[in-house]
Amino acid sequence: LVAPARPRAILVGPGKRFLSGISYYTYGLGRALASERNLSVLLIRRLVPARLYPGGGRVGQQLSSISLPDDVPTYDGLDYFWGPSAIRTLLFLHRQQPDVLVLQWWTGTVLHSYLLLSFVARRLGAKVIVEFHESLDPGEQNHRFLAAYVRLVSPRLFRRCAAFVVHSDSDRELVRSGYNIDPALVKVIPHAVYDHHAVTGARAPRPDGICNLLFFGLIRPVKGLDDLIGAMDLMDDVEAGQYRLTIVGETWENCEPIVQMARESRHADRITIVNRYVSDEEADGYFLNTDLVVLPYRKSSQSGVLHLAMGYGLPVVATNVGGLAEAAADYEGGELVEPNSPSALLDGIRRARDLPAGTFSYGHRWTDTAKAYWALIDSLSGASENVDDDDDDSSPLLGRTA
């Protein structure tokens, strides 16, 4: 007897031109999946017009050395306006003949392209999986036109899906309530720890017992940086002298006043601000010089920064929102606090300040993610077709839309 051929998969996600946390995830997942089986990767190259992107000034800069194995067929990539890139994308799909198409979802800007890809992939006989990083980008949720567009059009995509992947039970409920997706079709695969940063030096010792705090990542309203600054301001001069706070991140959604708040803090002399998107090498330096990472988020499905901090074995103070509690549940260096409270944040910092940096580990690795993904893909390859070809909103995958 001849064993049946293993299913072939194409992974679709953002490339490095519009570098983001989802870019790092796509490359990490791509490397992990390719280490187990044959995989192809299709990258989204131009996400939106650069002038409309909050970080448009750095679009196309070489800020990261992340890469895929040379033997992984890759097309980089598909542009938002399609044009010749769409033709080359369709040819790539036809050459690869996938059994499964895995789409990374975090923003409505990819919806029209994902509709095209899912339509063509299914005509080639492939099943479609959507992996949610957010139900929708927080900024887009607050944009009436974009939110309405996604609400009206996304059922056409999700009806075509054989399965969905999220990173936590919290996210499963989020996509159920947000898109009326049957929870039975949603597989929880925890976010793997980030290990793409090559550690290039030794961890710096604490000078004079100073605890170095790090806020890292995009500065947005949902990130709660103002609560962290408020926590610093609650310290008296003696206590503040025991800390240094470094803020590293690009400003989005008109959050310049929050950066100004840090500059005008009563302890501004204890705060360093690096107000831009930094390279991998710079990020490595900041994490190696950090004793405690603080995530004062007001809302979060998951956090790439959390998994990056855990990759460095650093203590983390995080708010108990979204899937953060589940992600940090088995991490001994995690300290959870209530959101929207500078005083609770300060208490968490005080409790965690003496935890030994660089000594903790997180159990879920990329190899675990790859095994879970391929098991899901294998289960779909033997399943009967259970998705609709038409655009009827009463599809069995999705309940009737409101």
Annotated model-derived regions:
Residues S170, A192:
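Carbohydrate-associated surface elements
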Residues G13-L19, G30-R95, E250-N254:
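N-terminal strand-loop element at the rim of the active site
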Residues D330-Y331, E335-P342, I349-D354:
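Conserved acidic donor-binding segment of nucleotide-sugar-dependent glycosyltransferases
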Residues P205-K223, I229-M232, T246:
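Conserved donor-binding/catalytic core segment of Leloir-type glycosyltransferases
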Residues P315-N320:
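Short hydrophobic beta-strand element within catalytic cores of glycosyltransferases
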Residues F119-R123, L146-F164:
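Membrane-proximal helix-turn-helix segments that form the acceptor-binding/catalytic region
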Residues A162, G285-S301, L314:
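Acidic donor-binding loop of glycosyltransferase active sites
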Residues I258-Y277, E281:
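Nucleotide-activated donor-binding/catalytic signature segment of Leloir-type glycosyltransferases, i.e.
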